[in-house]
């Protein structure tokens, strides 16, 4: 697409669980007056002379083992994120989940890269996949509607169902945390209707054969379902919780509160919820019979651990 400077390339017919190599080249279009009258400029590329090609591995089609890292509530603190993740060997993990509020608002492309994309590329994103789950702050700003261009999904929505081996992941979009009529949104929000539409999609997703036959079922939702009395939390709880309680969920990961929290399964929420703070990351290792979780803070200090059996 010669009229754009942002390119999303979809690779088809890749084999599951297979390592691929790639390099990037892009040639400038200086002028395009009409038809085939194109004047080209310089070509920029990844470093093809001094380093090996980038490598990535596609998700496996089968298997119960899975490992991933979760980051959330960075709010543009790219330097803090870099320091926090300095000792992580990202090559050991299947993906990195960005679970919302990586920016405080999204005003332009330059800010998006400055807030976390450039740091993510330097740390891992050239070779380890990102799964992006929008938080309430990423709905804000004049450039917010463009976020999906940088993190496209197969279904064209901010919520989706993903599968790694036989493990299913539900990425649920929380929308905003305050009523749509709040002065902060300037009359531009309609998240009650948006969440109702998402709820109907969720009902179909958990009824799908892919989800029902999964070896484990993991949910990512930026705002915790039991995260307080704000309007967004209440609306999410009223809509999503009755469906999730009947769906055999093994674990939910949330953020939003900027502090660690753990909510064991109970009669109201029938699955455990782990809430990550804004000064830590989560490492999750899944096997056929357990989920092992470590919450790691600055300096690589393990602050909390959890382990859950898979029934």
Name what the model sees in each region.
Residues 2-8:
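Aromatic sugar-binding surface patches on proteins
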Residues 3, 26, 31-109:
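N-terminal active-site segment of His-dependent metallophosphoesterases
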Residues 9-16:
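Short, flexible loop/turn segments at beta-strand junctions in immunoglobulin-like
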Residues 10, 24-55, 110-207, 239-245, ...:
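Extended active-site neighborhood of metal-dependent phosphoesterases/phosphodiesterases
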Residues 16-26:
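Short beta-strand segments enriched for Tyr within beta-sheet-rich domains
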Residues 69-72, 95-101, 128-136, 218-222, ...:
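Active-site neighborhood of phospho(di)ester-bond hydrolases with catalytic His/Asp-centered motifs
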Residues 76-81, 104-107, 134-143, 177-181, ...:
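Active-site environment of divalent metal-dependent phosphoester hydrolases
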Residues 185-187, 191-193, 209-252:
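Active-site-proximal segments of metal-dependent phosphoesterases and phosphodiesterases across multiple
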